[in-house]
């Protein structure tokens, strides 16, 4: 499985996550709160073949914070969530304070 890092407005991001974020079942897991993105976001997307298994958008704030506001992991797989967190920590820990809301 690959975890790909994508800019928040990348056309590839939309191609990968649109089928998930438009599903009612995925939105329910996010308390019916829509997923959103911007140029301030970087998304970590786990995929293999034609299947996306999850994603974690990270927003960089003016205060030097890498903020995780929501995520989706298929089947609530704790191993995949841990892998996402390791990737995010490795990428941001030197330059940003990492916070999850």
Each model region followed by its residue ranges:
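Short amphipathic alpha-helix that is part of the acyltransferase structural core
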Residues: 1-30
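Active-site rim helix/loop that mediates acceptor-substrate recognition in acyltransferases
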Residues: 24-47
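Short acidic/glycine-enriched loop/turn segments that link adjacent beta-strands
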Residues: 40, 62-64
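Conserved beta-strand in the GNAT
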Residues: 45, 50-59, 67
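Conserved acetyl-CoA-binding loop-helix of GNAT-fold acetyltransferases
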Residues: 76-93
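Conserved GNAT acetyl-CoA-binding A-motif
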Residues: 92-101
């Amino acid at each position: 499985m690959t975890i790909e890092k994508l800019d928040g407005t990348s056309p590839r991001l939309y191609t990968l996550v649109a089928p998930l974020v438009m599903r009612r079942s995925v939105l329910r897991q996010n308390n019916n709160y829509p997923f959103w993105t911007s140029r301030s976001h970087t998304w970590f997307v786990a995929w293999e073949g034609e299947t996306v298994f999850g994603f974690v958008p990270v927003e960089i704030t003016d205060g030097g914070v890498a903020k995780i506001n929501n995520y989706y992991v298929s089947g609530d797989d704790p191993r995949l969530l841990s892998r996402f967190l390791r990737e995010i920590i490795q990428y941001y820990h030197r330059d940003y304070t990492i916070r999850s809301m």
